[in-house]
Swiss-Prot record:
Transforms N(2)-succinylglutamate into succinate and glutamate. Zn(2+) binds at residues 64, 67, 159. This is Succinylglutamate desuccinylase. It comes from the Bacteria. InterPro entries: AspA/AstE_fam, AstE_AspA_cat, Aste_AspA_hybrid_dom, SuccinylGlu_desuccinylase. It is an enzyme of class 3 (hydrolase). The lineage of its organism: Bacteria, Pseudomonadati, Pseudomonadota, Betaproteobacteria, Burkholderiales. The keyword Zinc applies.
Amino acid sequence: MPAAALLDDFLAFTLAGEAPAERDGACAGGAVRWQWLGDGLLAFEPAAADAAARASVLVSAGVHGDETAPIELLSMLVRDFAAGALPLACRLLVVLGNVPAMRAGERYLDDDLNRLFSGRHAQVPASREAPRAAQLEAAASAFFAAAPAGSARWHIDMHTAIRASVFEQFALLPHTGTPPTRAMVEWLGDARIAAVLLHTAKGNTYSHFTAEHCGALACTLELGKVRPFGQNDLTRFAPADRAVRKLVSGERAEGGATLPRVFTVIDQITKQSDALELFVAADVANFTAFARGTVLAQDGDYRYTVKHDEERIVFPNPTVKPGLRAGLLVVDTTRDTLAALV
């Protein structure tokens, strides 16, 4: 298939499952060099020689194959700067994550790809997601290893959520052992992200991997509800899309944007067995608040009771496999977190 088809509609090209006739070339009137690195993997770099100051940005979508809106936005981003309609001012790696699941219209085929990073894929060698997790780790590692010394490194991993949320668009920041950076929190404010969830333990997500192993400023964005391809109202994603476009084109974020509220994980509900009961409505929204003393879950001898004056539940899901997280509990830490930004 001609390379023009790859750049004009990266999504359709990837879903078709073909390789381009050329694996690299130039676009945007010769201003940008591109390289196809494999299914759903495209690298770009400005042809100009000012590499020393150039940021390295990884933008990913489709780590869950049914989260279509960010995939569509990412394909349009590629189209626009390949055509010269949007300048490219950074090294850029564009990733469509779980391509077989995208083709099937499923979240995943065997295992949640976003739980298989930082080497966890080695524990499930029979999983159809395991080789892809290893491939995405290798691609990110090689991309950031080639970054100019001292230059900025970013990873924006875009998702949509299965359920509604008190805050329709929110972000998750991986645990790094240090406070969040002002650059990331201000970028999230510019993207009109209403809330940020801070993890307090290492995880196996894509953004955890790039933060810990590649030194990237990394976040997972939850940008709304899961819908089939072609059924998304992309205007609802416009602020986040604009912020990503500013990041890759080198445009400064607007000053004075409202910073998001910040919530910190204080516990999780882990599914011990198939007897787990969650005492919340099946359609409870992410960030729904519960008062001290409320019993939220029971699983055999295990019981989770709210310990703070107010805790909010995020990602409740009793259908996960035993041993996996069935819900996160968070508390509001906005004041202390914003005061400690670095």
